Amino acid sequence: MPSVKLKENEPFDFALRRFKRSCEKAGVLAEVRRREFYEKPTSVRKRKAAAAVKRHAKKVQRENRKFQRLY
């Protein structure tokens, strides 16, 4: 859990902004959204497999773009 200590003579808005930034970096909101509803283990596996396929297709497309002629 991210925590922020209020510095001396620091406005609350700045501390709040630092806290929000640290929460974003820690991935707190993404984790909350992911755990908002129960997801069956089969759905988790299916989603991860689909993401892997998408990543692979993106990688192949990026590699093919290197060899494409520009004339």
UniProtKB/Swiss-Prot annotation:
Basic and acidic residues composition-biased segments: 60-71
Pfam family, one: Ribosomal_S21
Gene Ontology CC terms: ribonucleoprotein complex; ribosome
Entry's Gene Ontology molecular function annotations: structural constituent of ribosome
Compositionally biased residues, Basic residues: 48-59
GO biological process: translation
NCBIfam families for the chain: S21p
Family: Belongs to the bacterial ribosomal protein bS21 family.
Region (Disordered): 48-71
UniProt entry keywords in alphabetical sequence: Ribonucleoprotein, Ribosomal protein
UniProt key word Ribonucleoprotein: yes
Top-rank taxon: Bacteria
Record's protein name: Small ribosomal subunit protein bS21
